[in-house]
Swiss-Prot record:
Annotated membrane topology: Peripheral membrane protein
Name of the gene encoding the protein in the UniProt record: lepA
Name of this chain's protein: Elongation factor 4
NCBIfam families (UniProt xref): lepA, small_GTP
Stored HAMAP family: LepA
Organism: Mesomycoplasma hyopneumoniae (strain J / ATCC 25934 / NCTC 10110) (Mycoplasma hyopneumoniae)
């Protein structure tokens, strides 16, 4: 196959800027998928992706256009899924930068463009939704030039929804994106693993981009990170359905089935090479994924623990970023502590478990990894608040900080700066992008961002602000563990880590919420928030009482007193042994205590 006829590219866009729609139009225009078979968001395979209008898993598809072969790698646009983007960009030579004509450049678009520039990709600016009344093409062109520093003079103007300008996009791919580097078939094989999924009949299917050499059916290859060896049983391309081939050559993107039974054997971003003629070094530039937040997942029905375990195993086959380990809680029984890339990532996993495996899940409040130095000098890394040592054994606590870059219209600057201050933010910089838009840079504690920062940012800015972040370092903070006691019993799953300055308002808010949520019992239930052994907030859930005197009529008053005393003694005994029923909403209440920490 002639290398000069291949073009590998990805589409970079913020959520809702029309990326999946553009991919649909390209598939339709090139007859890769017939109009009859084309579904909206064709490359988004999960129902969840279509419902939320977002791309979660990346997809690779081969497209024929005239005498050329394109490999389009569809990428996610949300900040939580940056790892998916970085992994797909490394498999391409060019990127289509898709910008909404009415909204302009957003934070996540910029983050992904920088990833593309780091990979030395050719970037083609495309302005979408030009048919909208609010479209401002000249302003967006100026933004692209000022913010990113690439020429937007020849930016392609399209409407993906109405199919306007699609042919110009295809011609630009041919003329502007360079072909893959030429390579001799006899060169050692180097192929980048950029995705994988699990097939119940064929095991783990890996998606690869062949950089040098070739790979054929029957070849034995090894992963360079762990040296595990496998033989190729089938390989081929996606068009967008799988088509089998005998070999994949340099520049091609395709899939390989090799009876890989354990998903943990496949590390996305690894390099594969042939055992007989191995490459000396792997391809550069891949990082191991590190979760930024941790949450406990527990089945509502404790008998579904094994089903939850199997379900997590199956999902982790296609989502290599999920890290989990078993844990137990006195209140909730057996479950798992799971590491995520962000709050959206967590919500999506919970929805997938509930939909695909019919599980009912209780999720505890998300937390981050804290570095705790004990008084004896020992350093511990703890992500579960219930495992924190007692305050008198702690010498210092360090928490992760992020560098947040927030894009926003000038009119919302005051409110967003106020939000960052509420979240213990440290001001770094303010940049003027144009007459109307600003880029605000803050250092923020990660634990403050994972709760409701994104939602509040959107509501304060009427949806116009966007942000991206990176974890930068750990800093010493005045943090304390806040425990909740119900009827004198500590509920470990309700424990949380709070800043000393916000402990009292947060404790008061949480006890009031729990008082409203937890149903009344036959006995009085005190709800206490404690730090160490000190109670800092308390509410009482009043008991409901049975009218034991209802059957009395007339007679001596001592009879009435005797019945009431008997009821009182019974309630006292019940209070000692009674179990408080804690509904799922109580755990969600923790997420909602971040309303404002002023």
């Amino acid at each position: 196959m002639d290398n000069k006829k291949i073009r590998n590219f990805a589409i970079i866009a913020h959520i809702d800027h029309g990326k999946s729609t553009l991919a649909d139009r390209i598939l339709e225009f090139t007859n890769t998928v017939s109009k009859r078979d084309l579904k909206e968001q064709h490359l988004d395979s999960m129902d969840l992706e279509k419902e939320r209008g977002i791309t979660i898993k990346l997809n690779a598809v081969q497209i024929r256009y005239n005498s050329y072969i394109f490999h389009l790698i569809d990428t996610p646009g949300h900040v939580d899924f940056t790892y998916e983007v970085s992994r797909s960009l490394a498999a391409t030579e060019g990127a289509l930068l898709l910008v909404d004509a009415s909204q302009g450049i957003q934070a996540q678009t910029l983050a992904n463009v920088y990833l593309a520039l780091e990979n030395n990709l050719e970037i083609i600016p495309i302005i979408n939704k030009i048919d909208l009344p609010s479209a401002n093409v000249d302003k967006v062109k100026a933004e692209i030039e000022n913010t990113i520093g690439i020429s937007a003079e020849n930016a392609i103007l399209i409407s993906a929804k109405n199919g306007i300008g699609i042919e110009k996009v295809l011609e630009a791919i041919v003329n502007l994106i360079p072909p893959p580097q030429a390579s001799d078939e006899k060169d050692p094989l180097k192929a980048l693993v950029f995705d994988s999924y699990f097939d119940i009949y064929r095991g783990v299917i890996i998606f690869i981009r062949v950089v040098t050499g070739k790979i054929s059916v029957g070849d034995t290859f090894k992963f360079m990170a762990n040296n595990l060896k496998f033989s190729v049983i089938e390989l081929g391309i996606s068009s967008p359905n799988q088509v089998k081939k005998e070999a994949l050559f340099a520049g091609e993107v395709g899939w390989v089935a090799a009876s890989i039974r354990n998903a943990k054997d496949v590390e996305v971003g690894d390099t594969i090479t042939l055992v007989e003629n191995p490459a000396k070094s792997p391809l550069p530039g891949y990082k191991k994924l590190v979760p930024v937040m941790y949450t406990g997942f527990y089945p509502v029905d404790s008998q579904q623990y094994n089903l939850l375990k199997d379900s997590l195993e199956k999902i982790s086959l296609s989502d290599s970023s999920i890290i989990y380990e078993p844990e137990s809680s006195k209140a909730l029984g057996f479950g798992f502590r799971i590491g995520f890339l962000g709050l959206l990532h967590m919500e999506i996993l919970q929805e997938r478990l509930e939909r695909e495996f019919n599980l009912s899940i209780i999720a505890t409040a998300p937390s981050v990894e804290f570095q705790i130095t004990r008084t004896n000098g020992q350093v511990q890394i703890i992500s579960n608040p219930s495992l924190f040592p007692e305050p008198n054994f702690i010498s210092e606590i360090r928490e992760p900080y992020i560098l947040a870059k927030i894009f926003l219209p000038e009119e919302f600057l005051g409110q967003i700066m106020g939000l960052c201050q509420d979240k213990r933010g440290i001001y770094v910089d303010l940049e003027y992008i144009d007459d109307f838009r600003r880029r605000l840079i803050y250092k923020l504690p990660l634990v403050e961002v994972i709760f409701d920062f994104f939602d509040r940012l959107k509501s304060l800015s009427k949806g116009y602000a966007s942000f991206e972040y990176e974890v930068i370092d750990y800093q010493v903070s005045k943090l304390q563990k806040l425990d909740i006691l119900l009827n004198g019993q500590k509920i470990d799953a309700l424990s949380m880590i709070v800043h000393k300055d916000f402990a009292y308002p947060k404790a008061r808010d949480l006890t009031q919420k729990l008082k409203e949520i937890i149903p009344r019992h036959s006995f009085e239930v005190p709800v206490q928030a404690v730090i160490g052994s000190k109670v800092i907030a308390r509410e009482t859930i009043k008991a409901y009482r049975k009218d034991v005197t209802a059957k009395l009529y007339g007679g001596d008053v001592t009879r009435r007193k005797k019945l009431l005393e008997k009821q009182k003694a019974g309630k006292k005994r019940m209070k000692s042994f009674g179990v408080v029923d804690v509904p799922q909403e109580a755990f969600l209440a923790i997420l909602k205590t971040n309303v404002s920490e002023k």
